[in-house]
């Protein structure tokens, strides 16, 4: 009887211990993504790191192999790399950090390729993916991610040597096309080949650097990818003027940031930070005139900038500060300023806005549009 009582005591203690452990684990996992970000003090953002105009380490003396999240990289080099990441996708991350911390530099960048990007989100290694990712139905419903608003309307194109006389996909019959694996470009190319009964060969490569290395070596006669990526990578080729992007467009490629779908608050935060960039341009608010606009009597501007500072402001309802839109504009500007800085005519990788103009652009209306802030 005594032995049974001792056993029961130990059993009860074990149960209580397990319950306590489960409770602690539950408490830890119950923290929202916003709370976790605030506690650690920075945003974890996944970018490519090797795509000029979108996300690129602007350091000539840093080898591209240093971007592979190597834990053995000396801290001074790591910090130098982190401070030198620039681009359109990078500025999306900086806008999110600005809204949360009032500091655009409160970001740590992880350099990821197309194959690992979704695992990085689902595993919690990154809080947001800003990596020229195409929004598709398969990704939307099959992977545990939620897409933010589209930030760049793109299409799939083909890069060839100008002297090759190739002017269409059909002209590549019997030739080799290089494409990055695990991308919509790869699947679209396979569909085109089957649908049109074409005879080119598809060479899939995981590393984008290998795609262009083999292309320059003549092992493939064309590269296919998003037109924006072709345009920016074209600048990195040894003789850029010897190559052209064909006029033929193979697909629609709406590019958007993405987050994990298990935290609705975080989904809404990222969504309305992106919309804030667009709304700021629509309202004519930019880095230069922000302070002047704060004196406006326009109710739309008052509401958007959170000038009343009330508890029911847009920012407060998201879990952010009432002036979150002001923070974004002050540090990174509006959507148009981000585009101009990274992809505008005076940038190192100019790409015409075209479809990425605001919907109400009088000369060339685009598709960029924000729901009402009310």
PLM feature spans:
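Ligand-binding cleft/hinge of the Venus flytrap
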Residues: 56-64, 68-73, 79-82, 94-105, ...
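Sec-exported extracytoplasmic/periplasmic mature domains
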Residues: 38, 97-105, 122-126, 134, ...
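Bilobed "Venus flytrap"/periplasmic-binding protein-like clamshell domains
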Residues: 44-53, 78-100, 134-135, 154-210
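Extracytoplasmic small-molecule ligand-binding "clamshell" domains
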Residues: 27-131, 320, 335
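C-terminal motif of bacterial Sec signal peptides marking the signal peptidase cleavage site
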Residues: 18-21
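Acidic, polar ligand-binding/catalytic clefts
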Residues: 62, 94, 98, 102-171, ...
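Bacterial N-terminal signal peptides that target proteins for export
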Residues: 2-10
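Extended ligand-binding regions for polar small-molecule ligands
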Residues: 23, 27-28, 34, 92, ...
């Amino acid at each position: 009887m005594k032995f049974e009582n001792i056993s029961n005591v130990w059993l009860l203690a074990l149960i209580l211990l397990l319950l306590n452990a489960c409770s602690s684990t539950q408490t830890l996992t119950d923290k929202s993504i916003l709370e976790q970000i605030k506690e650690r003090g920075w945003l974890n953002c996944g970018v490519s790191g090797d795509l000029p105009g979108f996300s690129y380490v602007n350091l000539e003396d840093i080898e591209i192999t240093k971007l592979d999240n190597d834990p053995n990289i000396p801290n001074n080099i790591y910090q130098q790399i982190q401070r030198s990441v620039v681009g359109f996708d990078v500025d999306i991350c900086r806008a999110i950090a600005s809204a949360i911390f009032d500091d655009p530099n409160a970001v740590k960048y992880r350099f990821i390729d197309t194959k690992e990007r979704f695992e990085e989100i689902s595993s919690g290694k990154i809080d947001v993916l800003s990596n020229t990712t195409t929004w598709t139905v398969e990704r939307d419903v099959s992977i545990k991610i939620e897409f933010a608003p589209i930030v760049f309307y793109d299409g799939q194109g083909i890069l060839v040597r100008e002297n090759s006389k190739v002017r269409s996909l059909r002209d590549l019959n019997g030739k080799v096309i290089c494409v990055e694996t695990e991308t919509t470009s790869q699947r679209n190319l396979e569909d085109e080949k089957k649908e049109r009964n074409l005879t080119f060969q598809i060479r899939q490569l995981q590393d984008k650097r290998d795609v262009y290395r083999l292309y320059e070596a003549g092992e493939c006669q064309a590269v296919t990818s998003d037109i924006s990526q072709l345009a920016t990578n074209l600048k990195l080729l040894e003789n850029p003027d010897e190559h052209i992007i064909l006029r033929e467009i193979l697909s629609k490629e709406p590019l958007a940031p993405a987050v994990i779908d298990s935290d609705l608050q975080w989904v809404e935060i990222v969504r309305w930070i992106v919309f804030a960039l667009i709304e700021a341009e629509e309202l004519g608010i930019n880095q230069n005139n922000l302070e002047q606009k704060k004196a406006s009597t326009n109710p739309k501007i008052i509401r958007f900038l959170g000038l009343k500072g009330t508890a029911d402001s847009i920012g407060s309802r998201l879990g952010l500060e009432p002036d979150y839109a002001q923070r974004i504009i002050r540090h990174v500007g509006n959507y148009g300023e981000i585009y101009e800085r990274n992809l505008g005519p005076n940038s190192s990788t100019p790409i015409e806005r075209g479809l990425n103009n605001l919907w109400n652009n009088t000369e060339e209306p685009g598709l960029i549009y924000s729901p009402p802030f009310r």
